[in-house]
Regions:
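Conserved non-transmembrane functional hotspots
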Residues: 1-139
């Protein structure tokens, strides 16, 4: 009887872990989709900024503190860029580079939180990734 109870407990824990993993992947993907939409046209609007608070709140429910902090940095940078002017703001190239860098840090924290790897992506690889993305966006 004890073994059966233990097996049931393990199966339930496994299902819970699987569901949590799926939820985390979904919220991380949603955040990347929102940020991608913002950066694709090179402009930020109030409507775009307003899409971020609820994913941040959901992160607090699901993600590690490191993930939350990393995304807050992205959000803070987007707010800083948007705060410069009026209703629709053009994102300067230097601001895009910083946003991409922060998104790369966020991505790395997501990777660790999902236990894809307990080793962070090499900082040099992150730097090259940001450089490649920045170069591609200038064309």
């Amino acid at each position: 009887m004890f073994l059966l109870n233990k097996q049931t407990e393990i199966e339930q824990e496994s299902k819970k872990s699987e569901r949590l993993f799926d939820e985390k992947v979904n919220i991380y993907q949603k955040i990347f989709d929102i940020c991608s939409d913002m950066l694709m046209d090179g402009k930020l609007s109030q409507d775009e900024i307003n899409r971020l608070p609820f994913p941040l709140i959901k992160l607090q429910m699901l993600a590690s503190e490191d993930v939350i902090i990393a995304f807050q940095e992205v959000f803070n940078e987007l707010n800083r860029v948007y705060d410069v002017e009026g209703e629709v703001v053009t994102i300067q190239d230097s601001d895009k580079v910083e946003i991409y860098r922060l998104l790369s840090v966020f991505s790395n924290e997501c990777r660790k939180d999902l236990e894809i790897s307990d080793v962070p992506v090499d900082p040099e690889i992150q730097k090259m990734t940001v450089s490649t993305i920045s170069s591609a966006n200038k064309k």
